[in-house]
């Protein structure tokens, strides 16, 4: 079971709708056109059309699986005093005295450029359930990170 924000669920549902209603029919039509051009063994256009159709089908199945096995998170039901899914947490790396802030999200919402880390990442997992002032330890490739929670907010 995966948990998604309402926004991310809607984005994935919209992508699925586009793929099913527009991209797949276009890919199937293109494949039929390329197939009608004769010898498939020497038809690069046919092979490319088939690759695009297979990629589209794969993405459709992937999105269907995510949406079928996901639940939308109710932000009002989340704790406000502990790090949880959708929490924006500011913390200090005690080894380097560096302050950072990230939002904890599901793996399907992770986007480092947008400041979103997965709850399954080493840092996300270590911070989950912590309160302000508590210290978490995360295992990273560079060694153990000691992180002190400075603030927690829900966006």
Role assignments for model-derived ranges:
Residues 57-71:
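Amphipathic alpha-helical coiled-coil segments
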Residues 73-155:
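Non-DNA-binding regulatory cores of transcription-related proteins
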Residues 20-23, 67-71, 131:
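Conserved NTP-handling cores and scaffolds of large molecular machines
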Residues 12, 16-19, 31, 63, ...:
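Generic leucine side-chain signal with a strong bias for well-ordered alpha-helical environments
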Residues 1-58:
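N-terminal cationic and glycine-rich segments that engage phosphates or anionic surfaces
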Residues 37, 68-75:
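Short alpha-helical linear motifs
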């Amino acid at each position: 079971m995966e948990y998604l924000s309402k926004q991310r669920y809607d984005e994935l549902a919209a992508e699925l709708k586009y793929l099913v209603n527009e991209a797949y029919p276009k890919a199937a039509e293109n494949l039929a056109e390329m197939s009608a051009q004769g010898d498939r063994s020497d038809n690069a256009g046919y092979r490319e059309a088939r690759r695009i159709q297979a990629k589209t089908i794969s993405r459709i199945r992937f999105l269907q699986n995510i949406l079928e096995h996901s639940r939308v998170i109710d932000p009002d039901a989340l704790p406000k005093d502990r790090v949880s899914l959708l929490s924006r947490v500011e913390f200090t790396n005690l080894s380097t005295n560096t302050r950072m802030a990230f939002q904890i999200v599901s793996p399907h919402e992770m986007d480092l450029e947008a400041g979103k880390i997965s709850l399954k990442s080493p840092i996300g997992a270590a911070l989950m359930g912590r309160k302000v002032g508590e210290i978490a330890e995360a295992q990273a490739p560079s060694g153990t990170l000691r992180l002190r929670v400075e603030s927690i907010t829900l966006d």
